Amino acid sequence: MKKTFLILLCLSMLLVACGGSAVETVEEPAATEEVETLDAPATTVAETLDKIVFGFVPSAEQAQLLDNIQPMMDLLSDGLGIEVEGFVTSDYSGLLVAMGSGQADVGAFATLGYVTAMNAFPTRFEAIAKSVRYGSGSYHGTWWTTDASICKSTPVIGAFENINGVPTLVTGSTTASPDVAALQVGWGFGDDGLIPEVRDGVTTSPGLACEADISVVTGEEVLFVEEGSTSGYLYPALQLKNMGIDYVNGITPRFAGSHDGVIAGLYNGDAKFGVTYDDARRTLRKTNADVGEKVIAFAITDEIPNDVIAVRTDLPEDMKQKIYDILAEYIATDEGLAIMDEIYGWTDLVPAVNSEFDVVREAAEEFGLYDD
């Protein structure tokens, strides 16, 4: 495609070289060449490094994010026995360059950001943890339509879930949310679980879904998020390719620029097909309570691994394990859960499995993100 990632990477490297860096300039950790000494007795963290730098990408105002992560940095410092400094980059390419150049030791990456980082610096990165959101370690893209005539049967209150690898329509009712991982439009949290959502006296319509063949988009205008969106373009476009549908010439692709932009475009009649994460209809519910019945789910993509925490591969193994243990224990506390849910929507951490990212790598290769 347009080599978007490589352009960002080059710009980020140029900024770092010129001193106008997209990340805070931090002192490179000393003596990293002594990290792996097979014949030496196990070293303590304090003997190996004097500081760990943990990078984040903004999900809110930078100052607020720094305030939110400070308690976690303090816990890591206490547990590791050395200073842990948190810093915020301007974007994922900035975090990639910071870790690839040794300016940062740990980073919180989105899935595609981690995969492209691994390709750019194949020996520098290692994912130690994957985030969990409300019990799920993955998510998917959802295909939407405003044309109920494409449905094989009348749309119902429900949502799609990949069950044993098979996209399955899970139904709900006016009083019971469909039992799926993603929080669906029309539902909110009550004392006893999910309840119908009422805002300012207006009931938000529960989301409708139906089964339809993805091939119905052939020859049609389709709203995508942006070319770098995993759930909002890469996975669904790869899905079309694998079905024998040209995702450039077999449809008319349009890019709304954001997930809520896709939903708004569908709601306003700009197109009758689109794709976002599940359930992006919630972004429009405050102003358009009927979005769940006007924008209908009809298919989903394969599962996409959640965000990861990656570390430099040359960190000591005992340090990697301690970092994981401290973070996993932190998010299991009320304070840690509240902070991580606010920052990234994380509710738990599990060990990362490298093979889970193979489909993301396939998509990155298909769309030229690895081109020279």
Predicted regions and their residues:
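Short helix-initiation/N-cap motifs at beta->coil->alpha
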Residues: 86-97, 210, 215, 246-264, ...
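Short beta-strand->loop
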Residues: 125-135, 250-252, 285-303
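Bacterial signal peptide processing site
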Residues: 19-22
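A ligand-binding cleft/hinge motif common to bilobed small-molecule-binding domains
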Residues: 108-122, 238-242, 267-268, 272-293
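C-terminal motif of bacterial Sec signal peptides marking the signal peptidase cleavage site
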Residues: 14-17
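A conserved helix-loop-strand patch within extracytoplasmic ligand-binding domains
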Residues: 130-232, 238-243
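Extracytoplasmic small-molecule ligand-binding "clamshell" domains
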Residues: 45-113
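An extracytoplasmic/periplasmic, membrane-proximal ligand-sensing/linker region
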Residues: 35, 46-56, 60-71, 311, ...
